[in-house]
């Protein structure tokens, strides 16, 4: 009778030990960007592509992320539509604006989510060699 109880206790101890030592549960909290970006209007605060800062070229554009997956960019009354989505498993946002504007098309990509808060969302593209960075700021 004592042997199964000792084995069970030993197994529980080992599981708890490995869980504590390996940090299971640490760093797994993921904050989705969707609840933040769908709360209003945003502007591009930082766009670094191929080592060049391009946010100035996008000055005046506002971005609205709709919960339906649509995105609208507006500057001087001109509306540019597109689609966006968030993949919570891969922790990334995909943006696809229907435009030929060479600077606005730089937003069309799959962006890894670096950080999310009420005022800023910081994204990074690690799929290409340039390591582009994008930060949008709430207006």
Where are these regions (language model features)?
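Lipid interaction determinants
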Residues: 21-83, 89-139
